[in-house]
Amino acid sequence: DRKTDIAVFRDGDWYILQSSNNTFRAQHWGAPGSDTAVPADYDGDGRADLAVFRAGAEASSPTYFFILRSTSNTEQTQQFGTTGTDRAFPADYDGDGKADIAVYREAGGIWYILQSSDNNLRGAQFGLGNFQDQPVPRDYDGDGKTDLGVYRKSSGTWYLLQSTAGFAGAQFGISTDLPVPADFDGDGKSDLGVYRDGTWYLLRSQLGFGAFRFGLAGDTPIPSVP
């Protein structure tokens, strides 16, 4: 219904409160303790699909995406990534309306994207790696494609590689802030935002700077970046 549903992922089980009919749904998809939830619309039907990212038992072993497609109720298993260095950041990087399988490799700050539009592998070095940057992929220029982005924790600086508008950099935040990029002013572009001890600091593309108190120190802000 184009509305985000309240949901939690617990030890391989999904608990979802569906906004369309206010009914509760529970479904098992994933392994207890080891999987990371990576829900996204992988098949382009307008509904988020249940999906998990699973690391291997040993360093340098392959990682896998396990996706339950909502359109066909079929499973997609995709080996993609390496244990110990890669983190999953699926999003629609090619603008075809489907989330692409993607990882950010801390060894070198390299993005690897499996584009759903043509099944081609795209690689791009953007970021320092070695856990110095927090990946923050979002659509910052409003062209319908997710842009590569990192938040450099040491300086509070944002570095964006926008698919249409090109490179951009901005200092916004301090080293202890949590990045919370999202479209806070409704213009179709993600805005820069950080959360600091219960205060949201936003740099909005239309409305400019704003600071709002909501939450307590130690809270996890939503939206947040994994």
Predicted feature descriptions by range:
Residues D1-P226:
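Trp/Gly-enriched beta-strand/coil motifs that build multi-repeat beta-propeller-like domains
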